[in-house]
Amino acid sequence: MTSLHPAQHLTFSRRSAAALAAAVLFLAGCGEEAKTTAADAAAASKTTPAQQAPIPVGVVQLVEHEALDATVKGFIDELAARGFKDGENIRIDHQNAQGDQATLANIGTRFVSNKSQLIFASSTPAVQAMARATKTIPVVATAVTSFEAAKVVKSDAAPGGNVTGVSNLSPITAQLDLLVEIAALTPNTAKTKPIGVVFNPSEVNAQFQVDRFKAAAEKLGIEVLTASASSVNDVPQALNSLKGKICGFWFPTDNVIASAAATVAKVAAEAKLPVVASDSA
């Protein structure tokens, strides 16, 4: 497979569209009658269901929140724009794991049993589950910080295997500089105080970003205080445990934090603390 696409400056729906470049190539090769050329793929997209059965495509997201919803919508919309329409020449099976790892595993088994010819996975846990479920079905993923750190590819530069996609790694050093600058201008905060980080340590992508953020902060002589939140219910306590000790919050791309965005905003506003986050959900 081709190298992974670093799309940290794209919007989430654009990330899905970028990943589609690989997806269309896979779809063009699906089915006994399909060929690998762009012209043949376009012709195949115009065949009727009576001529060719719709190609089964699995779509899975870890949980429902704005960012992941946008990736799925962008992927499906771009497929349609390129002639691959659900219910016509493809059949999309969209599954939501509701944040449950066991459900993700079951979804992977479902896609394999249903002979999906392509799987689109949104989030790191989702692509990890799909990579465990199949070594042959092409898996295209987005909302993943590092495919290599997630251990679903040999390396981000040369994935190999059946998994590829789009990275959403944020410009961490620039985010740190921005937070320090804002904290220095914010009343009742002091840039000499530590920076607070709340994240789900069981999410590989979140831990990967936090490690990088800590390393960047250490170079500037800035302390980082962390608190873990394994579920949305843990977020308020984790946030409150850092209030009064920090000059501001930084958050990595993290599905738990994204799902609790309203809570994060409320607590930070009440504490009059600036926030810099990798996710806009």
For every predicted segment, state its role:
Residues 2-13, 18-21, 26-281:
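Short hydrophobic alpha-helices and adjacent helix-cap/hinge residues
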